[in-house]
């Protein structure tokens, strides 16, 4: 069993949000609060510590009460750059990630990922849902050991960017969640409106 105090949560808010007109997605209003604040309030009780990966509007994210770390790599290279920024600063043995645009992920997600990581002797545990009868991984919802930092940096410096390709280089437990809607994110303003309805 992994104690929640041994896990740091990382909110991924460093993307370009090109499908949302390049606005800062984590700062978009959702039921009266920024999307990223919903993620922080959902993730916070599941972990011992929390931080945010963002590349714009850093003061607005810092006002949410968590340390904010930008990508070390330029040009919005994707979630793995956020993973690296978090792993470089993580002071617990494990780190779990959640994107800023998915405010309804399960309240027991972290404990379920942690249980699977231990049960399967894995280095990474990744959430998955079923869509149209097929298992679909949710690669930005994953728990990892922090000793994977060197592997991740090597992967990024080779020019690779796909989370699943990197994760599959390690022992990865896939954890199925029944409610696919819990992992619904807002990639466009229309999807954000749909989430609010």
Curated annotation (Swiss-Prot):
EC number, as in UniProt: 2.7.7.77
Gene Ontology terms: cellular component: cytoplasm
Q: Which UniProt keywords apply?
A: Cytoplasm, GTP-binding, Magnesium, Metal-binding, Molybdenum cofactor biosynthesis, Nucleotide-binding, Transferase
Which residue stretches, if any, does this entry annotate as coiled coil?
A: none
Q: Where in the cell is it found?
A: Cytoplasm
Database matches in InterPro entries:
MobA-like_NTP_Trfase, Molybde_CF_guanTrfase, Nucleotide-diphossugar_trans
Molecular-function GO terms, alphabetical: GTP binding; metal ion binding; molybdenum cofactor guanylyltransferase activity
List the cofactors: Mg(2+)
GO BP = bis(molybdopterin guanine dinucleotide)molybdenum biosynthetic process
Q: Which residues bind GTP?
A: 12-14, 25, 53, 71, 101
Which reaction does this enzyme catalyse, per its entry? Mo-molybdopterin + GTP + H(+) = Mo-molybdopterin guanine dinucleotide + diphosphate
- Please name the top-level EC class of this enzyme: transferase
Positions that bind Mg(2+): 101
Q: Which HAMAP family match?
A: MobA
Domain note for this entry? The N-terminal domain determines nucleotide recognition and specific binding, while the C-terminal domain determines the specific binding to the target protein.
The UniProt entry's sequence similarity note says: Belongs to the MobA family.
Q: What does this protein do?
A: Transfers a GMP moiety from GTP to Mo-molybdopterin (Mo-MPT) cofactor (Moco or molybdenum cofactor) to form Mo-molybdopterin guanine dinucleotide (Mo-MGD) cofactor.
Q: How does it assemble?
A: Monomer.
Q: Mind telling me what this protein is named?
A: Molybdenum cofactor guanylyltransferase
Write down the species: Bordetella pertussis (strain Tohama I / ATCC BAA-589 / NCTC 13251)
């Amino acid at each position: 069993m992994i104690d929640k105090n041994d896990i740091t949560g990382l909110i991924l808010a460093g993307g370009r949000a090109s499908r949302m007109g390049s606005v800062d997605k984590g700062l978009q209003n959702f039921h009266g609060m920024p999307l990223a604040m919903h993620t922080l309030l959902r993730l916070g009780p599941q972990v011992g510590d929390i931080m945010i990966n963002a590349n714009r509007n850093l003061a607005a994210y810092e006002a949410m009460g968590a340390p904010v770390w930008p990508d070390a790599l330029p040009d919005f290279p994707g979630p793995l750059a956020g993973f690296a920024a978090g792993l470089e600063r993580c002071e617990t043995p494990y780190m779990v990630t959640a994107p800023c645009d998915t405010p309804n992920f399960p309240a027991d997600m972290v404990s379920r990922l942690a249980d699977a990581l231990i049960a399967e002797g894995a280095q990474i545990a990744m959430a998955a849902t079923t869509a149209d009868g097929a298992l679909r991984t949710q690669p930005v919802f994953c728990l990892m050991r922090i000793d994977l930092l060197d592997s991740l940096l090597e992967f990024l410096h080779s020019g690779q960017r796909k989370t699943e390709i990197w994760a599959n280089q390690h022992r990865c437990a896939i954890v199925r969640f029944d409610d696919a809607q819990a992992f619904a994110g807002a990639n466009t303003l229309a999807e954000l409106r749909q989430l609010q309805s």
